[in-house]
Each structure stands twice: as C-alpha cells, then as structure tokens.
Amino acid sequence: MDSESVVAADGADCAIANGEVTMEGDSSNGNGGTSENLECCSTQHPMEASEGTQNEQVDDSKQMRGQKVQGRVKHEKTSGGKNIPSVLVKKKKDGKVVASNGSVAPNVKPVKSPKSKSLNGREAHVTKHGNHDSLPAEGTRDKPKLRETRKQVNDTSEDDTQYPKEDDGKPRRASALPNYGFSFRCDQRAEKRREFYSKLEEKIHAKEEEKNTVQAKSKETQEAELKMLRKSLNFKATPMPTFYQEPQLPKTELKKIAITRPKSPKLGRKKTNSRADSEEAITIQTPRFGRLSLDEKTPKDNPVVEGSVPGETKKPPVRKSLPRLPSEKTNLSNGKVAPAKAVTASTKAKSERKKPDKDVDDLSQSSPVDDNADPEDSQEQAPRVNEDRNESHMVVEVVAVEP
C-alpha cells in the first residue's frame, strides 16, 4: 500500500508515532460530547480530496511547507516499513482522542467540530503520491494569477504615489501632463502687460488726434486773422521795385599771365660776337637823348658819356615854327662834330631814315610862317636848311644809361 500524508487547512496536524494516528486541534466548544469518525489518510477516495483542493487558493509559501512535510513523512514510512491502516478516531467528553485499539495518544488536543469547520470554509487536504503530478499543474495555474494580481496592486499603488488623480478620481496616464488646479503667474502677468500696452496705445492715438485738430484750428485762425488785417488796412502794399535791391557783384575773371623766361646765354660763342651783341644790347636798352640847341652848353653836373659829342646836351622842347637867329649860324659853322667810335652801322641807318622825315616836317610847318616874313629872311633860311641836312649825316645820337 502507498504511503499517504494528511494536512489540515485550519492548522491541525496529523502525527504518526508507533503506528498510531493522533490528531491535534483546538476545540471551539469544551462541552462537545459527540464523537465523530474522521477518514484520514484513506486511499479509497483520492479524487474527492483533489476536487476539494481546486476550489481553494493557497499561497506559495504554505504549499512549499506542505511539500517539505510530506517528504519527511514519506521518508519515515519507508524507513519503518509499516503500512498505516485507516483508523477511527473518537472524541470523548474529557477531550481526549482514543484510537480503535484502545490506546490513548499522548499530547492530544481537542478537535474542532464540523460546524466550526463549515463556518470557516476550510477543509482538509489529502494528497496522494500517485496524484502528486496533478497538484503542481494546478499550482502553476494559480501562480500566474497571483502574480498578475500582485502586479496590478503594485502598479496602482505606484500610480497613486507618483501621479495625482483627476477630480473624478480616475488615474492619469504616465504620458499625459498633470492638470493642476492653479494657473501660472507668468500667464497672469502676460495678460496684465497686454492690457497695459493696449491702454497706452489708445492714449497715444488720442493725443495724436488732439494735436492734429489743434494744428488745423490754429492754421484756420491765423488765416482768418490775416484776412481781417488786410480788410482793415486803408492802403495796399505794392511790391518793392527791383532797383532798390542790391545788384549782384560781377564776377572777376582771372586772366592768365604769360610766363616769359629770359634766354640763357650761349656759352659756345666767339668773343668778338659776344662783344658786338653786348654793345647792341646797350644801345637798345638805353633811352635816346634829344638834340641840344647850339646856343646851349652842356651842364657841368651831367658827365659826358663815351661816344657822345662834347657840346651836345639835353635839348629842351623848342617851337619848330620860330626862325633861327644869325648867332646860331656862326656856331654851327665854327663847331666840329666828332663821330662816335662805338656806333654800329645799324644805328646810323636808322638815324638817317628818321631825320630827313623830321626835317621835311619842319619845313612844312615853317613855310606858312615864312610866307608872311620878308623875302630876305626866306633867302637866309634856305641855306640854313641845307646846312642842317649836311650836319644831320655827321651827328650821331648819344646813348646814355639812366642811373
């Protein structure tokens, strides 16, 4: 016969000692005089016991403890080599449990009544070695259910602690933001700023409109006042004539002055040529002195220039129309004119060309005067003119350098 083990759900334990079965339990009623027969460790109804276990949920820890106890009981049975028969257990009024063979088990405690067991809703579990495989299968079914329930409980507790619930009491999702009952101060301040700026803009627009209206009124009043003044005036003002206005100054045109530079002297010339050129330059640059009259003498203050006649001096302006005196004739006949040493041929030719023209002019001017004069004077003047012509060839113009 196979070994069996008995486990009580309400805390009662079955002990095997010396081939006898004893049962320990707490009695709810101390005065219970009825005896009952418990079928424990029976091999006749293993399926009924297994069906009763399916309706109950047992924690993992209790199942593990029960399995350990079963292993110990089996080991003791195999070592003893005895088979345990089914035993009827009776309960006396004294509260002691007596076996069918008449021996009393030591340390026996009163057993609970079936009423208390039915009230508590717990039953004894009987497991058999042959049906051991069916129990772990049922335990594996119960384990995922327990894990799922535990996970749900833990998730709900974490959600309650981490995220607040809505007003309705429904938990929020993890991704959704919490809806707080208050609003941020930033939003309130932003609204106040908008209101303040809108009021400022309205004030600014109102001020601008007032300014525009005031300016328009001021212009209208000024125009009306000017019209009244014009009407009150007895005369009309005419525009100012143009000649009262100051004329604009004429613009002075700047004339460009021609820059003339003197020619540089040629150093490669001969000495003779350089002397002749210097003499020509002296004659050209120095002014010419007029002829002196015969009766005048050269002053002592003015020195005589080289190449000049000693008797010649500056000639004061004399009227050409006046006749010459006989004393002048004698001076001209007695005086000798010395030719100039440093006079060139060019100066002589120029003087010869100019002097005959002057003499012709003198004759033309003196002719009307001579007509009125005596015939004797006219005869005397004729030889004078001839003498003057002859002397003009011999007279050389004196060149003097002004200091």
UniProtKB/Swiss-Prot annotation:
It is found in: Cytoplasm, Cytoskeleton. The keyword Phosphoprotein applies. GO terms for molecular function: microtubule binding. It holds the Pfam family TPX2. InterPro entries: TPX2_C (IPR027329), WDL5/6 (IPR044833). Expressed in seedlings. Residues 103-118, 336-348 have a biased composition (Low complexity). Residues 263-273 have a biased composition (Basic residues). Keywords: Cytoplasm, Cytoskeleton, Microtubule, Phosphoprotein. Residues 120-132, 139-153, 162-171, 385-394 have a biased composition (Basic and acidic residues). Its main location: cytoplasm. Residues 1-179, 254-403 are annotated as: Disordered. The keyword Cytoplasm applies. Residues 25-56 have a biased composition (Polar residues). The modification Phosphoserine is found at residue 113. PANTHER family: PROTEIN WVD2-LIKE 4 (PTHR31358), PROTEIN WVD2-LIKE 5-RELATED (PTHR31358:SF29). Belongs to the TPX2 family. Microtubule-associated protein (MAP) that regulates the orientation of interphase cortical microtubules. This is Protein WVD2-like 6. It comes from Arabidopsis thaliana.
